[in-house]
Regions:
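Switch/communication elements of ASCE P-loop NTPase nucleotide-binding domains
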Residues: 1-13, 422-575
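Amphipathic alpha-helical scaffolding segments
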Residues: 2-14, 49-59, 178-189, 463-468, ...
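Conserved P-loop NTP-binding catalytic core
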Residues: 2-57, 90-91, 95-103, 109-111, ...
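Short polybasic amphipathic segments
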Residues: 28-43, 52-54, 210-213, 423-439, ...
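Long, solvent-exposed N-terminal ectodomains/accessory regions
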Residues: 40-60, 68-76, 80-84
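RecA-like P-loop NTPase motor core
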Residues: 87-96, 106, 141, 147-156, ...
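Acidic, metal/cofactor-coordinating or nucleic-acid-engaging core segments within structured domains
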Residues: 104, 108, 479, 506, ...
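Extended helical coiled-coil dimerization/tether regions that scaffold
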Residues: 115, 122-145, 149-489, 519, ...
Length: 633
């Protein structure tokens, strides 16, 4: 909550500039001091009702101070809104926190509802409790809100200091959607690791990227078109546009203003349309559907998002029996497309994927995307890659291997198959010598992501969330003018959920391998915070780095046991405060067996007693019970 309030203070007033991010809420009434160290300096983040303050205690300086406007007895400070340059100076002295927790009982919205404040602008007048309150001020919401909800959304360009994972809506995780998102994260990570020749420890071992298999799903285009026409033309049951009509319409409009602008500015492959045979649909349908989708998406963006309000009247829509036509003035269309090129937000993500896919395909009917496709593509320069400010003409493999010089997973995420396609990620397995494992016929073993076990998927989901965000964060250039974090706090809450014990055992080593890879040419700092009940994880952590809790309180130091390289079975009992070393039901049966062998009255039959005695796994316990004889007395 303290970090949320801290972020609110320096982020307020930027809603229009970051349209993809949900606005943060400020939670008043919090009195807390958070202490941390960066390098050799000690810091204090202080929250006192409506005041948030960050101090360097070593230098005895105040780095950041802000209050809510005219709230309680707080005196408003002169500074209310901070630009990105000022935010950069603030976060230089703070850290970025990435939290993962897959427990269904965690982060439920209703448990985090509080009276909150929000930053109101002219569009928020209906949400203001007292209509007389000023706009562009902190205003009290009319009813309690869940302050935790906006932190799940990661569309702020990594400005805020905190993100929670996985995404929850009203406390619920959409498992199907999370699986889809995890596949995208895992794919972009594997591709980025394999495509760029940086020193690798293969923290995803034993897996390695093989390829993506893709197939156009024309029904997805029709569904999107139906929704589009319902929204903008109020047509509830539009007729399906036949594939032939779509391609013919595309061929007719290839050289219109809109078509030329899309091809020229996005640098799409130049199709020789006069040579296209109309019965050769398969070869060109990918291109036709993608360009048609780009047109629809551009129209929708200009009508829907405030960031594109200056282009709201640029495009005009015409709908007929067998066509949907979108057109506009050439100069205005060019301005729109140039604006799209410079927009890295989620708004244009689908367009980026469509354009990048068409450039990867090079005018062919692409069914498989391999490492070779990506390497060639980025060496030839992506239009969006250039637009992101990375204009170095030197091939990727010859560049210095630092965070400022290699591409982030976000770039590769933008090159995954567009929404019109069904696709699957295939992985190879590698041995300890990094050799790909083959089957009996000598063919590489290829494992589709959707056929992996739930434990394997859980491991990749948890790991990829942190790896994905970290690799994006460290790839932000110091020259970009954007706030850049150099200190990271990784929080793995209940990390062992659904994981196989062996995956728990190697988890710490995997994290270390990841951080070693990320630190190639960098100077970042990391704090790893794990909340766990797993002795498999505890065995890799020194005792002095562990905080033991019992009933919410830290236990006495004399009760702590050495953990590093400790026997995992022994730690299950000693480090997690278990009262017994065997199950409760087994204990009851053993007590009843002992009473029977002592000749006392029980409900246990002789046959059951013999069966239980033979089933005892501990040979010492079994031997001791066998020595018990009936008491003749």
């Amino acid at each position: 909550m303290a970090i949320n309030n801290f972020c609110y203070m320096f982020e307020r007033g930027h809603k229009r500039e970051r349209p993809g991010a949900d606005e943060l809420y400020y939670v008043p009434g919090l009195f807390l001091k958070l202490y941390f160290q960066l390098n050799k300096n000690s810091y204090e983040l202080k929250s006192r009702y409506a005041l948030v303050e960050l101090q360097d205690k070593t230098e005895n300086t105040t780095i950041f101070e802000a209050t809510l406007d005219n709230i309680g007895n707080e005196k408003p400070l002169a500074k209310q809104r901070f630009n990105d340059s000022e935010i950069s100076s603030i976060v230089d002295n703070f850290f970025y926190t990435i939290v993962s927790n897959y427990s269904m009982q965690s982060f439920v919205d209703d448990n985090y509802k509080r009276q909150i404040y929000f930053y109101a602008d002219k569009d928020d007048i209906n949400r203001i409790e007292q209509k007389k309150e000023f706009i562009d001020h902190d205003c009290k919401a009319a009813y309690p809100h869940s302050w935790i909800s906006p932190i799940f959304h990661k569309n702020d360009g990594y400005i805020r200091s905190l993100v929670l994972n996985p995404y929850r809506h009203n406390g619920n995780i959409n498992l199907s959607n999370e699986f889809k998102l995890s596949k995208e994260r895992v794919a972009s990570l594997f591709i980025s690791i394999d495509t760029i020749d940086i020193p690798k420890r293969y923290f995803f071992r034993p897996y390695k990227f093989s390829h993506l298999e893709i197939k156009l799903n024309a029904k997805k285009f029709q569904y999107y078109l139906d929704d589009f026409l319902r929204e903008f033309e109020n047509i509830n049951n539009p007729r399906p546009i036949p594939k032939e009509s779509l391609i013919l319409d595309f061929l007719r409009k290839t050289n219109d203003d809109f078509g030329l602008a899309i091809q020229n500015i996005f640098k799409l492959p130049n199709l020789q349309t006069e040579e296209i045979k109309l019965n050769d649909y398969e070869k060109f349908e990918n291109f036709c559907y993608c360009v048609a989708y780009i047109k629809l998406k551009l129209y929708k963006i200009t009508k829907k998002y405030d960031a594109y309000k200056d282009f709201k009247e640029v495009l005009n829509l015409h709908y007929g029996e067998n066509f949907v036509q979108i057109e506009g003035a050439a100069s205005q269309i060019n301005d729109l497309l140039q604006f799209v090129l410079k927009d890295p937000s989620h708004i244009t993500k689908k367009i980026r994927r469509l354009v990048n896919f068409l450039c990867l395909a090079k005018g062919t009917y692409l069914k498989k995307i391999t490492k070779k496709n990506f390497t060639q593509y980025f060496n030839e320069k992506s239009v969006f890659y250039n637009a992101d400010g990375k204009t170095d003409e030197e091939p990727i493999e010859h560049r210095p291997q630092t965070a400022d010089d290699y591409l982030s997973p976000q770039i590769y995420d933008d090159c995954l198959p567009p929404a019109l396609f069904d696709w699957e990620l295939y992985l190879n397995k590698i041995d300890k010598n990094e050799n790909i494992i083959t089957d009996e016929m000598g063919n590489p073993i290829e494992i589709p992501y959707n056929q992996m076990s739930s434990g394997e998927v859980q491991f990749l989901q948890t790991f990829s969330i942190h790896a994905y965000h970290l690799m994006n964060l460290v790839s932000i250039s110091n020259k970009s003018g954007r706030p850049k974090y150099n200190n990271f706090n990784l929080v793995f809450d209940e990390v062992e959920i659904c994981m196989h014990p062996e995956m728990q055992r190697v988890f710490i080593k995997k994290i270390i391998d990841l951080l070693v890879d990320l630190e190639t040419g960098n100077n970042n700092s990391y704090n790893i915070f794990i909340i766990t009940h797993s002795p498999f994880i505890l065995s890799d952590i020194p005792t002095e780095n562990i905080l033991y809790l019992e009933d919410g309180c830290a236990i006495e130091e004399k009760r702590r046991k050495p953990t590093f390289a400790q026997n995992i079975g022994d730690m299950m009992y000693s480090s997690f405060f278990m009262e017994k070393t065997i199950g409760e039901f087994a204990e009851e049966k053993l007590k009843e067996l002992i009473r029977k062998r002592q000749g006392k009255k029980t409900h246990m039959s002789d046959q059951e007693a013999d069966a239980i005695l033979k089933s005892i796994g501990d040979p010492v316990i079994r031997s001791l019970i066998e020595e018990i004889e009936a008491n003749d007395d």
